From Swiss-Prot:
Keyword Cytoplasm among record annotations: yes
Keywords, ordered alphabetically: Cytoplasm, RNA-binding
Subcellular location: Cytoplasm
PROSITE patterns linked to this entry: SSRP
Family listed: Belongs to the SmpB family.
UniProt-recorded name of the protein: SsrA-binding protein
């Protein structure tokens, strides 16, 4: 069987910096035709976007999809609210997470899978400033250690 081809269109790198990612879900997204064309061209921004559960449905807010140049009257508002498509049991799990204090839903990736636009939705918990500093210090120490071993291996 052929390997599933996934083409990542946009990533929310800031989410990994600002949040602890607990769990991720794959969700479909309701889009218009011109929005899909714009997404395929890579004109999308996930930076300040987030999701909420309302009336047992999940909606994505602040995801900016630039208007398609040739779409004229068919273009929608770039920041409009978009519905996410998830199974009922997944939505119930998300409701359980979000009702806990400090948890939120953040889109981390937007990608094409078998020709369909999908969103990777993460259940996330906000990081405090000292957590961010800790991560930066850990990353710096790791890169310094790798650099040291590489120099030792090469005999420099």
């Amino acid at each position: 069987m052929a390997k599933e081809e996934i083409k990542i269109i946009a990533q929310n790198k800031k989410a990994y910096h600002d949040y602890f990612i607990e769990e991720t879900y794959e969700a479909g997204i309701v889009l218009s035709g011109t929005e899909v064309k714009s997404i395929r061209m890579g004109k999308v921004n996930l930076k300040d976007s987030f999701a909420r559960v309302e009336n047992n449905e999940v909606y994505l807010y602040n995801m900016h999809i630039s208007p398609y140049e040739k779409g004229n009257i068919f273009n929608k508002d770039p920041l409009r609210t978009r519905k996410l498509l998830l199974n009922r049991h997944e939505i119930n799990k998300l409701i359980g997470y979000v009702t806990r204090k400090g948890y939120t839903l953040i889109p981390t990736k937007l990608y094409l899978k078998r020709g369909l636009v999908k969103v990777e939705l993460a259940v996330a918990r906000g990081k405090k400033l000292y957590d961010k500093r800790e991560d930066i210090a850990r990353r710096d120490a790791k890169s310094e250690l790798e650099k040291h071993f590489k120099e030792k291996q090469l005999g420099i």
